[in-house]
Amino acid sequence: MIESDRIITASPFSSQEEVIERALRPVQLDDYVGQEKIREQLKIFIEAARLRQEALDHVLLFGPPGLGKTTLAHIIAREMGVNLRQTSGPVLERAGDLAALLTNLETNDVLFIDEIHRLSPVVEEILYPAMEDYQLDIMIGEGAAARSVKIDLPSFTLVGATTRAGMLTNPLRDRFGIVSRLEFYTADELGKIVTRSAGLLNVDVTADGAREIACRSRGTPRIANRLLRRVRDFAEVRANGRIDRPVADAALQMLDVDATGLDVLDRKLLLAVLEKFGGGPVGVDNLAAAINEERDTIEEVLEPYLIQQGFLQRTPRGRMATTMAYQHFDIIPSHQTTVPSLFDPD
């Protein structure tokens, strides 16, 4: 299975879906559900910056995909009353690409760089003085005739987003004044998000119907909204258009998303650990080969949720299935297997 084909992937499927997602995004912090600590911190920091008529400190947002990093970047710009310029690390191939963006910023604007961990070293070097001193330091000419030129920039806020905070260099990470980790959402929070999105989409959903979708959304708003749209389709064709718990359950079973939010690929990974490797430990490269997936897909897409839910444990010797994984598949461990619980030390 290709990761982008999964109904429960946190990555956008298409430009059309991105348009729908934008329509469902909250536009101010008061409408933002979840991430309470981050939301309260940003309220204070934004209000203080506005009172001083200064740019907000540079902000680094990190965590698994689909949790609202892009949404928060848009909200920050809106709450500050400034423009948002958006790009991504892979797009900024040359120093000139970043220089063009920086020189077109207006005072206190927000520059949002998604996947900031994928910036090239040469682009990152340009970013250091821009973040620290609001200056652009570029080289003009080549060889003996080359000279450094400093260009003053307006004050601005860089908002960086990444799913791989550990891949950021220390000099870049240290230049962010506000660093926030986004966590998976609770079922209650996702239920509120599903209910809000259903209202915007004119979908009739009951509280228990919204809860059923929320419980299978892997703690991720983007997945919750995607499942809501697919359950809506099912309800319109197979039911009376109203989403209650039985309708949501039937639709999600059809989509092969089980009660814990696991799909075919999740189950394939866990069963490989359980059956092919005796519950582990198994190295990630061997595991990737066993299920015919990329290492990055396992580390960035599958593992975070499986570990967070207690199905998988990452140890110095490799990945191990937990007691919960054995119970989920009704598999009895062999007597040789030492099964870790969620609270065993790594």
Swiss-Prot record:
Subcellular location, principal: cytoplasm
Record function comment: The RuvA-RuvB-RuvC complex processes Holliday junction (HJ) DNA during genetic recombination and DNA repair, while the RuvA-RuvB complex plays an important role in the rescue of blocked DNA replication forks via replication fork reversal (RFR). RuvA specifically binds to HJ cruciform DNA, conferring on it an open structure. The RuvB hexamer acts as an ATP-dependent pump, pulling dsDNA into and through the RuvAB complex. RuvB forms 2 homohexamers on either side of HJ DNA bound by 1 or 2 RuvA tetramers; 4 subunits per hexamer contact DNA at a time.
Record's protein name: Holliday junction branch migration complex subunit RuvB
Residue numbers binding ATP: 24-25, 66, 69-71, 132-134, 175, 185, 222
Record's keyword terms, sorted: ATP-binding, Cytoplasm, DNA damage, DNA recombination, DNA repair, DNA-binding, Hydrolase, Nucleotide-binding
Classification via SMART domains: AAA
Family (UniProt): Belongs to the RuvB family.
Pfam family name, one: RuvB_C
Species this protein is from: Nitrosomonas europaea (strain ATCC 19718 / CIP 103999 / KCTC 2705 / NBRC 14298)
Binding site for Mg(2+): 70
Domain commentary: Has 3 domains, the large (RuvB-L) and small ATPase (RuvB-S) domains and the C-terminal head (RuvB-H) domain. The head domain binds DNA, while the ATPase domains jointly bind ATP, ADP or are empty depending on the state of the subunit in the translocation cycle. During a single DNA translocation step the structure of each domain remains the same, but their relative positions change.
Region entry Small ATPAse domain (RuvB-S), spans: 186-256
NCBIfam families: PRK00080.1, ruvB
GO MF annotations, alphabetized: ATP binding; ATP hydrolysis activity; four-way junction DNA binding; four-way junction helicase activity
Region (Large ATPase domain (RuvB-L)): 4-185
EC id: 3.6.4.-
